[in-house]
Curated annotation (Swiss-Prot):
The gene is cyp51B. It catalyses: a 14alpha-methyl steroid + 3 reduced [NADPH--hemoprotein reductase] + 3 O2 = a Delta(14) steroid + formate + 3 oxidized [NADPH--hemoprotein reductase] + 4 H2O + 4 H(+); a 14alpha-methyl steroid + reduced [NADPH--hemoprotein reductase] + O2 = a 14alpha-hydroxymethyl steroid + oxidized [NADPH--hemoprotein reductase] + H2O + H(+); a 14alpha-hydroxymethyl steroid + reduced [NADPH--hemoprotein reductase] + O2 = a 14alpha-formyl steroid + oxidized [NADPH--hemoprotein reductase] + 2 H2O + H(+); a 14alpha-formyl steroid + reduced [NADPH--hemoprotein reductase] + O2 = a Delta(14) steroid + formate + oxidized [NADPH--hemoprotein reductase] + H2O + 2 H(+). It comes from Aspergillus fumigatus (strain ATCC MYA-4609 / CBS 101355 / FGSC A1100 / Af293). This is Sterol 14-alpha demethylase cyp51B. Sterol 14alpha-demethylase, encoded by cyp51A and cyp51B, that plays a critical role in the third module of ergosterol biosynthesis pathway, being ergosterol the major sterol component in fungal membranes that participates in a variety of functions. The third module or late pathway involves the ergosterol synthesis itself through consecutive reactions that mainly occur in the endoplasmic reticulum (ER) membrane. In filamentous fungi, during the initial step of this module, lanosterol (lanosta-8,24-dien-3beta-ol) can be metabolized to eburicol. Its cofactor is heme. GO terms for biological process: ergosterol biosynthetic process; methylation. It is a single-pass membrane protein. In Aspergillus, the biosynthesis pathway of the sterol precursors leading to the prevalent sterol ergosterol differs from yeast. The ring system of lanosterol in S.cerevisiae is firstly demethylised in three enzymatic steps leading to the intermediate zymosterol and secondly a methyl group is added to zymosterol by the sterol 24-C-methyltransferase to form fecosterol. In Aspergillus, lanosterol is firstly transmethylated by the sterol 24-C-methyltransferase leading to the intermediate eburicol and secondly demethylated in three steps to form fecosterol. Heme binds at C463.
Amino acid sequence: MGLIAFILDGICKHCSTQSTWVLVGIGLLSILAVSVIINVLQQLLFKNPHEPPVVFHWFPFIGSTISYGIDPYKFFFDCRAKYGDIFTFILLGKKTTVYLGTKGNDFILNGKLRDVCAEEVYSPLTTPVFGRHVVYDCPNAKLMEQKKFVKYGLTSDALRSYVPLITDEVESFVKNSPAFQGHKGVFDVCKTIAEITIYTASRSLQGKEVRSKFDSTFAELYHNLDMGFAPINFMLPWAPLPHNRKRDAAQRKLTETYMEIIKARRQAGSKKDSEDMVWNLMSCVYKNGTPVPDEEIAHMMIALLMAGQHSSSSTASWIVLRLATRPDIMEELYQEQIRVLGSDLPPLTYDNLQKLDLHAKVIKETLRLHAPIHSIIRAVKNPMAVDGTSYVIPTSHNVLSSPGVTARSEEHFPNPLEWNPHRWDENIAASAEDDEKVDYGYGLVSKGTNSPYLPFGAGRHRCIGEQFAYLQLGTITAVLVRLFRFRNLPGVDGIPDTDYSSLFSKPLGRSFVEFEKRESATKA
């Protein structure tokens, strides 16, 4: 006791000579050190054999957030090598159990509604952007009805009508954009493709009134609303930050604008003159007999605009960047159009797009390596036993599926990190479709349980815009191939890294590519 008293007396005398700020700093460092020690001891001494292994980490709350956020795929593969397909890591204080491989995809993406919940995870982030009472801000049964409305609105007639509209938008953009005025030049890929995809989507899906506004008011509103997906909003979506105030103002203004469009159409007698989604939703009725309210139509249109734009813009940018590294593939695409469609290159149609096999493979291969969403997370609502193991995932965890891991795995795709559209010439990989289909309330869809290739997800939350995405990407790619040759800048090798900081992954930073107009484009 005398020794302890002597030590404490010495500490007190030393502290009495220090400033308050120094003492506060020492106190905080001491608390941090103690918390780190306790955290490490808990991991080493109190392992639960009935739960997946926890990825070792030094700091509580932070856990593995930083290493995961920098490069999720590297993190997943490193952890898989050490812990196997099932492991848990700390993501911003939340225990998140990852289950990789096709079994993991099935376990999570096809999890029963009573066991897993997407709304609890994504609603805080998406509701301020999309608006109330749609997508994740409503009961799952209502969401399934909303997905059915949108899916059934993408009829074959609608899709056929979109091809000439998308073609015209791309050609008009190239003709009028300052970036493409010369025979040769350099352009900012992500910026340019983002404009092309937003114009093509708004012209086709959104309607002519929305498209006309993108040359003025909508562009700024879209940008402000897009800031709602900023990384900090994963934690603080309701914080009174400047970008969130702009987000909220943009959401209100966009909602008002869509409702004005709907009101004007109703006052004009609701005479349908196009195949856009607004007309489709205006005629939809919920199962309880309630017509879809105009505000909900507006919010669904915003959700379509935001979610679809991110995924299409990112994928189309990667296609251009990949083609710039492989001019030989781009020339193959051009020759395919001449061979299949004719040397006069007739206007693109829905039917002749289906004949462009290599074009489809370029899109498929790009989605394999660059799926816009790398992680799909669900909250656990009931304890979930993992077949073949002793693990039971408790309700205090989230679960995470990463279909991109199987798409990058050697066991399914030889030389998985090589971008090679011709790998799809042979049936070396399982089809994206699955024999077993299920109706979650919006029509039969493949469960996708056995496929290593799921760029559009699987289960009840599978993307309903898959057909439109392939159509939009296919048309944009085909038009660009007709007009240009792309190549990397001198001294540039390969493609840029990936930015994983937002909900949707995309090329990191600004990426520039050389273009050269084809003779046919110059004459036109």
